[in-house]
Amino acid sequence: VKGVTNLNDAKEIIENDFSSVCNGGYLVVPARVLNAACYGVPQGRERVIFYGFKKSELTDEAKKQLSAKVISSEYDPYPIPTHYLSKKFCNENEIHYVNVKQAFYGLEEPKQSLDISQQKFSKAKFMGKHCQGQQEVKLEGIGPTIRSEHHGNIEFRRLSKEHGGIYIKELEEGNEERRLTVRECARIQTFPDDYEFIIPKKDGNSSVSASEAYKIIGNAVPPLLAFNIARRLQDNWTMYFGG
């Protein structure tokens, strides 16, 4: 998590520990904080990413480039951003961030949905906006960080007028105050809709509850961020390791 960069020398200690694996057989490039929103994830989720390369597998040029104080853009293993947080600074061919409204496109309300992950949501009551998880999501903005430890206090899809909700039209249409569903959290994390999070107990097999599903989603690296990391390595593979 990003907080590791705020601890005294923690990042450097971790980098040195990784480098010492297999008697110093790994080349570890300086860690970097990546914001998932810069890669098409509709969520402000920042994570520290470490890369370690087995020295014996790298080409001589790759070892030289990856050991440089400043790694060239060509050899840089970190993925190039695909989306930008400020529309003001986007070039013509660059894309603004994906917002929550776009992420929720096509989702029905829980009572109308046939998807069990869209039917289920935390019933924890509103506790006042001074507490964590008591805000409603901003549909035109980036989603909140989906947390694994939340004790039911998942952010709200919408609040009532009484609690300061701003989606008045939705409320007037009869939609209730409620927290984010499991599927909505999964959409914010960029999981595909065919990923089943809630599994009923059947034929003696173990089950997964809505509470457990929230935790699984919150613990995950957003799949779209992971994809961009992997694709960058794939694109540079021959350059790093030869033909």
Predicted features and spans:
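C-terminal target-recognition/interaction regions appended to catalytic cores
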Residues: 107-243
